[in-house]
Amino acid sequence: MPIKSDVKKGKGVKIPFPKLVNLYGCRLGKQVFVGPFVEIQKGVVIGEKSRVSSHSFICEGVEIGKEVFIAHGVMFINDKFSDSKKTGRGWKLRKTIVGDGVRIGSNATIFPVRIGKKSIIGAGAVVTKNVPPNSIVKGNPAK
């Protein structure tokens, strides 16, 4: 499992098991932690002091703020398919924006949305709509 040469890492980034991650063309801010069995795809930006726990998947088009905690097994999905537009080069992917200080519980699934700063996403939540700042959401769909 590779860390590609196009990955940009800020000072103090910690990847304790570099052979157990897939990182492609992403940008990791200062003091970011990436656990084992994580995949982070091209174009993803992760703000400083954020933590991505093991077995998580972060797809293209995701921007994560500073001091965000992503628990074990979180999946970011960048296409709802039902309302995506096909382009000449394939599907047009939608963005996901995660604000500073957000906490995302284990096994949550995050679709293309905006999650406001300091919000909490419960374990197992399926987030299909934007989350205002300072909110707590849980369930399927998350409310």
Give each language-model segment a name.
Residues 2-6, 16-28, 33-115, 140-142:
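Flexible, glycine/small-residue-enriched loop-and-beta-strand segment within the central core
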Residues 117-120, 125-129, 133-134:
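Internal alpha/beta core interface subdomains
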Residues 133-143:
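Conserved beta-strand-loop-alpha-helix hinge in the C-terminal portion
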